Amino acid sequence: MNILSVASEVYPLVKTGGLADVVGALPSALLPHGVRTRTLVPGYPSVLKKLKKKKPVGRFDNLFGHPATVLAAEVNGVDLLVLDQPALYARDGGPYLDSTGRDYPDNFRRFAALSLAAAEIAGNGIIPNWKPDIVHVHDWQTALTPVYMRFGPAPDLPTVMTIHNIAFQGQFGASVFPELALPPDAFSTQFVEYYGDVGFLKGGLQTASAITTVSPSYAQEILTPEFGMGLDGLLSSRVADLTGIVNGIDGETWDPQTDPHIPAHYGPGTLKRRAGNRKALEERFGLEKGPGPIFCVISRLTWQKGMDLVAEAADDIVALGGKLVVLGSGDPALESALMAAASRNRGHIGMVTGYDEPLSHLMQAGADAILIPSRFEPCGLTQLYGLRYGCVPVVARTGGLTDTIIDANEAALSAKCATGFHFLPVTTDGLRLAIRRVLRAYNEPKLWARLQYQGMKSDVSWAKSAERYVSLYSALLAKG
């Protein structure tokens, strides 16, 4: 079975969030099932620089006004197709934002081009001697792919649309529609028209053969007005085609027994070795050495991620005998609030702005607990990394966080299956109560070690999730 996966980012070439990790890791998990994946991504400068060997395998003479080349390459076992079109992707900023942090004004064109290229590859034999059996697209940036396929080269080829975060929908004014190379019929409620605008994600959800999202709980949540972000009605009408499949993690990249980014390697049976990583973490963040748990945050600093709650509870962590380290960037007001907390509590709270992949590994390996107080969370990956590294997750009871972490309540502790802490409501007081629960457990060394051990023994690999994707793909092909 051949799959064309289409995404705006893929680890390790370009990453702004968990989408890249998923797109980079899933193909390897599918391979043992006889499923071969080729992943199409834009040719950003950062991507092209990292491709050691690449060869042109296809060409567009005119893709949104400019010629484009499809390059084939392989990185970390991922079979890549890279859409090289400098007019759209050769930018100084990131994948979506310019160097000042603003959306590129032509993002609609940049990602429509990616989607149209995918549709042409799927249906018109752009790549010699290769065609996919199924096209799998990820998030709004690639959501027009099934729309182009419906009106163009591959109307009957099965498609899967995965929602990683429904909050990001790719909505643009109706004035962009004439530039999308779609027939007039596509600007209707059955396709891309969305309250008078053009909705990329909406179009994909209307036309894809199947819809997935990244956890069973989130699949249920997005059917409600509270979490559906205006698309709950559409999704409810397609509930029979909607599946929630939890993400896994790359067990080779995230392995505390071999991780090159941490000074002390350890496993479930050698947890005491984590002390070497704690020491390195304290030095990196300028923390005073001493007892008490270190809490960490590795996140975009946004309201959705509950970072205002962390800022409000930061002083309480210190007052209760804990420490806090933060890695992230985002809302300037939240950055300032967290930096102010660090200034008030020097030696007890440390912060690094931006994103640093090696540092995120050290934080998981050296901190005792990771705070994830998201107001909504489709799946989340940082809690899975926490399980793998014995960094006990403290999570809001929402979405994929609910599905992946077993709360340390009395029943779960008795059954020896607890792996972390849930809290609800998702408020500052709710988080404070959870922090107190963590401290009580931390002060019982045997209980704490058992929580870490149970988390580290959890199966957070892609194995089970890959089986579910294979079942979905097979069912689509069986429909004909």
UniProtKB/Swiss-Prot annotation:
Protein name listed in UniProt: Glycogen synthase 1
Keyword entries, A-Z: Glycogen biosynthesis, Glycosyltransferase, Transferase
Reaction(s) this enzyme catalyzes, per UniProt: [(1->4)-alpha-D-glucosyl](n) + ADP-alpha-D-glucose = [(1->4)-alpha-D-glucosyl](n+1) + ADP + H(+)
GO biological process, one term: glycogen biosynthetic process
EC numbers: 2.4.1.21
Keyword field contains Calcium: no
Biological role: Synthesizes alpha-1,4-glucan chains using ADP-glucose.
GO CC, one annotated term: cytosol
